[in-house]
Amino acid sequence: MAIEPEANPLALWLESHERFKVLPDDTLILPAHGLPFIGVQERLQQLIDHHEDHLDTLEYTCTTAHNSVELLKVMFRRELDKSQIVLALGECIAHLHLLMARGKMVRKLEDDGVYSYTSVNKNVPEPIKREGRVNEEIQLRV
């Protein structure tokens, strides 16, 4: 994000999933993390839902202004160690940039030099979680 501070990496990441939607659902997937599995369409939807849930939660939370560090608690409900904070902050900002690109969030440079983020819609409904429990069966169908 520092090299391209206005980048929208989450939009690119979500767009990349469209290329995988053409794969037959019985394709064997060999992921970089986790065990091989069959069920690409279900897994793609889980990943998309996970990020859309975060986007909804951030939009709901930002009906009052917050900076990205404050929003880490919203996205990551566990304690982050020092090595995780920078990565988590990048992910949080990526979500905020996508919300700005969608016209749902505005950013303001405050007097202290820190950006605050505020939802355009002040009446955002409380988010309803799309993402269900990760289906353990996906990894067992190999």
Give the role of each language-model region.
Residues 59-142:
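C-terminal regulatory/interaction regions
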Residues 1-55:
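Metallo-beta-lactamase
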